[in-house]
A protein has these predicted regions:
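Positively charged n-region of N-terminal signal peptides that target proteins for export
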Residues: 1-9
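Flexible, glycine-rich surface segments
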Residues: 244-328
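Soluble non-cytosolic domains of exported or imported proteins
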Residues: 104, 158-163, 179-186, 207-214, ...
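C-terminal motif of bacterial Sec signal peptides marking the signal peptidase cleavage site
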Residues: 13-17
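A short, structured surface patch at a secondary-structure boundary
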Residues: 73-169, 175-182
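Structured C-terminal subdomain patch of bacterial secreted/periplasmic proteins
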Residues: 207-235, 316-393
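Bacterial Sec-exported substrate-binding components of ABC uptake systems
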Residues: 19-118, 229-256, 380-393
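Extracytoplasmic ligand-binding site segments that recognize negatively charged/polar headgroups
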Residues: 108, 115-121, 133-144, 184-187, ...
Length: 393
């Protein structure tokens, strides 16, 4: 692989050094390059573009989308990413700042490493835009993604820290969508960009409001030109949640946790989106911090004694099986810590396990809210009426 990269980089340097020389055999030009040569006046100046229309957002704060006439979309993510999405029949503007990454529609050979984003593409009927996956077929819980890999229309191209550059280049990748784990291996970003693959680092995990995470559907819709569908879907989601968002708190306390291999307990901080989702659903989240920190890493690990002291009288326990594996019974939970037998929720049969496929289904957060509200308002809610929660007995 290193040999391939060195060869490719050497070729790029050789090309740049010889750009002034005319050669008998020239590489085939893209349609955009041919248009630019035939109609140089068709390309507007960057300074002339007026992004005077925006995609309405109600809860999301980590991205924005603006539009200019002529087929130009400006997308910003966080404070350090900006993209110019150019329509297929539009010319790339002149003098675009180097800090802005240019994307050309249609984006149809995406390398998706941020697995949580697949659910957005699935909802938009746009899984066919993804040619390369950062997960193997056996690791997908989203059926459309699994099916695409099984029929060969989507192929495995390596995980975030070890992409298969040869496969990526052969596929003609036009965008890599990464999660923030990529910042641990910045050399991968540099290498992808060097070989001509734009990189977008998605930040939905930095949305502190659960509804903001759901609204990221609109960001992916902008990439594939389906904003109207995304807006309608988001409004439908809000409508389905209106009954619980306006519902007063039940006053019931909820603890969301898992037990690691050393016997310590991992819990969400009070500012985490899961904690906020529980509050939106009508519960009182049991927190173990006072910071109200709101970021993607808002979890903490505490000793079982501390967890026992604060959560023994919790009305509801929800075990996070997306990290530790899905539990099948109370006995399996008690095997992790016999102390849990003293907990009020264990004695009353109000212990639930979140299913392991939840973490891949970003849009399912709305259903999760409905599930939590159901178990808070009716302790006899049957599993069949829930999507992601299953009672442990």
């Amino acid at each position: 692989m290193k040999k391939l990269l060195l060869t490719l980089l050497a070729a790029l340097l050789l090309f740049s050094g010889c750009a002034a020389q005319k050669q008998e055999s020239q590489p085939q030009q893209t349609a955009a390059e041919q248009t630019a040569e035939l109609e140089p006046s068709a390309a507007p100046q960057w300074e002339e573009l007026r992004f005077d229309t925006s995609l309405p957002l109600s809860y999301a704060t980590q991205f924005s989308v603006r539009y200019a006439e002529g087929g130009y979309t400006d997308i910003t993510i966080g404070s350090d990413q900006e993209f110019l999405l150019v329509a297929q029949d539009a010319a790339v503007p002149e003098n675009v700042p180097s800090s802005i990454t240019i994307l050309r529609q249609p984006l149809s050979h995406i390398y998706l490493v941020a697995s949580a984003a697949m659910d957005y593409f699935d909802r938009l009927d746009a899984v066919d835009r993804i040619a390369l996956s950062g997960l193997k077929a056996s690791d997908w819980y989203i059926e459309s993604a699994k099916a695409a890999m099984e029929d060969g229309s989507m192929v495995y191209a390596g995980k975030y820290s070890a992409p298969d550059y040869e496969t990526i280049l052969e596929a003609g990748c036009d965008l890599a969508i990464e999660n923030t784990m990529i910042y641990h291996t910045p050399e991968v970003i540099e290498q992808l960009q060097t070989v001509g693959v734009p990189v977008l680092v998605e930040r939905s995990s930095y949305e502190s409001d659960p509804l903001g995470r759901i609204e990221w559907l609109k960001l992916y819709a902008a990439l594939v030109g389906k904003e109207a569908q995304a807006t309608a879907d988001f409004e439908s989601c809000l409508a389905s949640l209106s009954g619980i968002l306006d519902h007063p708190s039940t006053g019931k306390t909820v603890s969301f946790f898992y037990i690691n291999n050393s016997g310590a307990v991992n819990v969400r901080k009070s500012g985490d989106y899961i904690a906020k989702a529980i509050r939106l659903a009508g519960g009182e989240y049991l927190s173990f911090d006072e910071s109200g920190e709101e970021n993607a890493l808002s979890t903490m690990t505490i000793q079982m004694e501390s967890f026992y002291s604060a959560a023994a009288d919790a009305d509801v326990l929800i075990y996070n099986s997306t990290i530790d594996g899905e539990l099948q019974s109370i006995d399996e939970l008690l095997a992790k810590s016999p102390l849990l037998a003293d907990f009020k929720a264990v004695k009353s049969g109000n212990v639930w396990c979140i299913t392991k496929n939840f973490y891949q289904q970003s849009l399912a957060l709305g259903d999760m809210l409905l599930d939590v509200h159901a178990v808070l308002t009716d302790e006899k809610t049957p599993d069949a009426e829930l999507r992601f929660l299953r009672r442990l007995s």
